Amino acid sequence: MSDLKKRFEKAVADSKNLPEKPDNQTLLKIYALYKQASAGDVDGKRPGFTDMVGRAKWDAWNGLKGTSADDAMQDYIDLIESLK
């Protein structure tokens, strides 16, 4: 396992124990970076207006389309570190 992957997995664990709950925009960014790092570009249709949470998550993830997994992992690590 690469050093980046190990640091990413540690950041994922650390994200569950942050001193304060991040605001919704930051939570969406955390979600999107995690999904981009672990699954790649978003796939499937954008959720409809009745699923506001799903739609916001999809939009955040879609905003990272084309970002490499390594870049998304590093951005995720940096974001979690800044929230500690």
Predicted regions: what is each one?
Residues 1-84:
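A charge-rich, low-complexity, intrinsically flexible signal that marks solvent-exposed coils, linkers
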